Amino acid sequence: SRRPLPARVPAGENPLAIAGPSCAFSSMDEPTKTARKPAWLRARLPGGPGYVATRKLVEDNRLHTVCQSAQCPNLGECWSRGTATLMILGNICTRSCNFCAIATGRPTELDLGEPARVAEAVATMNLRHCVITSVARDELADGGASVWAATIRAIRHRNPGTAIEVLTPDFKGNLAHVDVVLDARPDIYNHNLETVERLQKPVRVQARYDRSRSVLRHAKSRGFATKTGIMLGVGEEPAEVERTLRDIAADRTDILTIGQYLQPSPKHLPVSRWATPEEFTHWKQLGLALGIGVVESGPLVRSSYHADEQSARYAGEGRGNASVLATA
């Protein structure tokens, strides 16, 4: 059963009593003085037979990955392990979020063969846990929900033992479109808040904090395991991060990821600061104390980073009712 949100922890107080001089976020309000990344942000460079095989698989099946389109720093590690987060509905987004490297513009026509190719790629990679995401397709009547459903069903048919995690857009808050995705029965429903409420407009101008929360609450109300993620380094304050974690816990979200924002190009939102590994540990401990089941928090953490391990920990706590999760 879910750990209840501790009533004994008043808002604004740290339930772990770890705040103080040793854990003070002294750089929280200070802008980044140098473009040089700290040592803890060094990621594995692409290379090796696993990386080559994954790249060939993606290219041969004419697939898109968020690893490439979003310039994920973990691409080298994940592809070397033979895993990739596949991105459906093309690689051009109808939104223009200021943190995201994915191209914005007029999307191409729908590729009706994409669901089958995605399912085959999951089989070829022999994934026990796959993560599927997409661009936003606001120009479509259903926001792409029907393609989402077709993809989930194709993966399930071809790979009945694979846990399916979906990372979806907000479908402009249309819960009927969210239901189309949920009716296809993914194992984990992920939708990212991305940042604190105050910074929604400068970070992702076409989204809303309350709308994203409503999507997550709706999925939870239907009995699905839910997941969300936020970034540090876009101008947030410590109290705002705490408030966001409290909101996530109040929405009974099961899994939370917290990572460092990295500026994709000079045209994107600048990095306000480099959060330290100690700060990521602080927020992980706070999230767990508030009752969030699984918290993955670290400078290089992204939504799909070690997602299989997150779902295994979730299943290990006896949460959820999807037997597939136990094999992830």
Where are these regions (language model features)?
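Canonical Radical SAM [4Fe-4S] cluster-binding loop centered on the CxxxCxxC motif
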Residues: P31-L41, E77-E114
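Glycine/Thr-rich phosphate-binding loops of Rossmann-like dinucleotide-binding domains
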Residues: S96, L140, L199, P266, ...
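Auxiliary Fe-S-binding modules of radical SAM enzymes
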Residues: E13-T85, E120, N126, A150-T162, ...
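Extreme N-terminal basic, low-complexity initiation segments
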Residues: S1-N14
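A secondary-structure boundary/capping signal
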Residues: Q68, I88-L89, T133, L167, ...
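Core AdoMet radical
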Residues: A101-V118, V122-H177, V181-R217, K227-M231, ...
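Short, surface-exposed acidic/glycine-rich loop or hinge patches that mediate macromolecular interfaces
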Residues: N91, P169-K172, G235, L300
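Nucleotide phosphate-binding site architecture
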Residues: P73, T94, E197
